[in-house]
Amino acid sequence: MHSRPLPTLGRHAARSVLNSPNFFIGNRAYPLKSSVGAKAILYTAGILGGAFAGYYLFNARSAIHEYLLCPILRLATPDAENGHRAGIFCLKWGLAPKLLFDEDDEVLHVNVFGTKMTNPIGCAAGLDKDAEAIDGIMQGGFGYMEIGSVTPLPQPGNPKPRFFRLPQDDAVINRYGFNSSGHDAVYSNLSKRVTSFLKSYFAKDNEIDKLSLYKNKLLAINLGKNKTGDEVKDYLKGVEKFQSHADVLVINVSSPNTPGLRDLQNESKLTDLLSQIVQKRNSLIQNGNVLGAKTHKPPVLVKIAPDLTEPELESIAVAAKKSKVDGIIVSNTTIQRPDSLVTRDEALKSQTGGLSGKPLKPFALKALKTVYKYTKDSELVLVGCGGISSGQDAIEFAKAGATFVQLYTSYAYKGPGLIAHIKDEVTEELKKEGKTWNQIIGEDSK
């Protein structure tokens, strides 16, 4: 079929428009006095378009991260550990999105360790093992950030592959085995960050007195032991090395990937270990911290496994009370493989290591409820961790006894926007109930 030629008048009109010195919006013509004007409009449109695209790309609330960028990253990195490293690289160098206009609603504020933390959503240990990307992660909206685990000496961890995705379950299995750059390297990273802060304009803000370097947000350092290290001395070395840099110190005795580590959860061993750690912490109080405080007494938390019986959890509560630590994180990864797993690849889901993500939630929540049963009459702070991926999950953990919560695996799957979505969901639900976060802590047991 032959195309129909333009009528004579139409051809003249078309040429007139194409050669017109006017810029058209709809049927209205705006005169362009020169090609310079045309270029200016095009450049302006390009700049505005680029600015909008940049704002969308670097705004943590954008859905593009969960539905496009994170899936692309997973496709580009079949080896999950390479994906982890790529994520840390982006967070470290400012290539990750930030939560713009991050002002938390008052209903999210939580009183913990003498601080009114801006929100109860924390980043769990394991994401940033070597303190490389603290700011990139904190700027996503967390109220609490935990680095590590950090071991005294550098160690490579277990042989690769050691990190596996179960995307159908929003879960991962890891057997990293405390791979760590060691105390000195992590201390150097932390010191450089503090030095840079003290030289900056923000150091003049007297309200920033937390070692996170963010107002009313906390930085925790998770301490581990070397594979062949002494089960007490390694932790004491960590306290001595990092007390001046940490708002909170965490003692990890629950990783399933270091031989014999979970044996430290035995009541007598745990009481002895934690008592010595608290004594070491107390002996260093007068040394102050790197921000110039004359005294500094970071709370000590112990992180436990979910794979414990009620009597074992009760004995941990007893050890925590006897040793006078400040709280318990419930929980680490699980060595169980629940029947609820959607993944059908037996070789994949039977990989040795700790399972985290959505399938961990029922185990962690059950353990938390049990620990709260034996600690609610004390001043111990409980931290909920395991399978949290929504505002409703966070609220469940709070009502079960958690003062605040932590997550990691869901953040890796859904991207930085998850934190804003969780905070929005929690805020909406709390306002619907006419309550604050502080008011719902332990509500299920009242």
Swiss-Prot record:
GO cellular component: mitochondrial inner membrane
Record-stated family: Belongs to the dihydroorotate dehydrogenase family. Type 2 subfamily.
Cofactor(s) it depends on: FMN
Pfam families referenced in this protein's UniProt entry, alphabetically: DHO_dh
Signal peptide as annotated in the record: none
Activation and inhibition: The activity is dependent of the presence of oxygen.
Transit peptide per record: 1-13
Keywords: Flavoprotein, FMN, Membrane, Mitochondrion, Mitochondrion inner membrane, Oxidoreductase, Pyrimidine biosynthesis, Transit peptide, Transmembrane, Transmembrane helix
Any GO BP annotation: 'de novo' pyrimidine nucleobase biosynthetic process
Cofactor binding note: Binds 1 FMN per subunit.
Descriptive protein name: Dihydroorotate dehydrogenase (quinone), mitochondrial
Enzyme Commission numbers on file: 1.3.5.2
Binding site residues for substrate: 129, 174-178, 252-257, 332-333
GO function terms (MF aspect): dihydroorotate dehydrogenase (quinone) activity
Record localization: Mitochondrion inner membrane
InterPro entries: Aldolase_TIM (IPR013785), DHO_dehydrogenase (IPR050074), Dihydroorotate_DH_2 (IPR005719), Dihydroorotate_DH_cat (IPR005720), Dihydroorotate_DH_CS (IPR001295)
Membrane topology value: Single-pass membrane protein
Keyword Magnesium: no
Reactions that this protein is recorded to catalyse: (S)-dihydroorotate + a quinone = orotate + a quinol
Transmembrane intervals: 40-57
Organism of this sequence: Lachancea kluyveri (strain ATCC 58438 / CBS 3082 / BCRC 21498 / NBRC 1685 / JCM 7257 / NCYC 543 / NRRL Y-12651) (Yeast)
Residue numbers binding FMN: 125-129, 149, 222, 252, 303, 331, 357, 387, 408-409
Active site residues of this protein: 255
Further comment: S.kluyveri has two isoforms of DHODase, a cytoplasmic isoform and a mitochondrial isoform.
Purpose of the protein: Catalyzes the conversion of dihydroorotate to orotate with quinone as electron acceptor.
